[in-house]
């Protein structure tokens, strides 16, 4: 993990996001139709796993980003396997693909630009305080 002034804040926020993803993934499905689009669920998967990847990329140096991506992908795979066993949820291979797209997009952005972003935010907050 990179040197942060408020590591507990960043970690607890990130793990709260993970817990929320786990909770939503194992809860009974709530039907929602915001845009009445068939791919809405897949877009939600891409965005969720993209944001998870970006969040945790802010906590670790660039050389650890692939490990972060493996963790986030493993989380998505694990949750899909749990859904396979739940009577009120269902497994969909396209969800794994959407998760992977989100993680890879987040990995690309973190390797290119955003790795360690938490440290840069803390630096700017100290400068303006």
Indicate where each model-derived feature is located.
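Membrane-interfacial alpha-helical segments at the cytosolic side of multi-pass membrane proteins
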Residues: 47-62, 103-113
């Amino acid at each position: 993990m990179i040197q942060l002034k408020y590591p507990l804040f960043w970690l607890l926020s990130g793990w709260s996001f993970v817990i929320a993803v786990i909770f939503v993934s194992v809860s009974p499905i709530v039907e929602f139709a915001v845009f009445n689009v068939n791919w809405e669920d897949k877009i939600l998967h891409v965005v969720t796993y993209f944001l998870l990847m970006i969040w945790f990329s802010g906590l670790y140096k660039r050389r650890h980003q692939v490990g972060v991506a493996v963790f986030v992908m493993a989380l998505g795979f694990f949750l899909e396997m749990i859904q396979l066993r739940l009577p009120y949820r269902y497994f969909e291979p396209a969800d794994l693909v959407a998760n992977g797209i989100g993680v890879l997009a987040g990995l690309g952005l973190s390797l290119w630009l955003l790795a360690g972003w938490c440290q840069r935010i803390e630096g700017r907050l100290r400068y303006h305080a």
